[in-house]
Amino acid sequence: MEELNELEKAILSKLSVKYPAIQEHMPFLRVLNREITGVGMYVNFCYVKDPQVSIPCLEISDGCISTNENIEIQGLKYGIGYEVDVSDGKIKFIEFITYGEEWDGVIKDYRFI
């Protein structure tokens, strides 16, 4: 398990504007794995437990949430889109998708547009 990278944290921070409880989940999220699909990537999460802290359930219906922004990434002409999957009150994964371009999952410079 590893810490979230800068982009993953930025996405969750942006979503926390509409869904503030996400901020309470972020300290406990770790990356379980990153699955490269060739035209996208899944970043699967798990939670680390702290017996002293109770993480509130996200009051978000099961499904996917997004800010509907695109992300410009160095090396991709059309950038990427993303959705965050929420199930059972927890953040399960981020799905990144390209718009038909091959992608190795490497994130160098990026910006939200």
What label would you give each PLM region?
Residues 73-113:
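Short, compact, well-ordered microdomains
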Residues 1-64, 70, 106-113:
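N-terminal domain-onset segments
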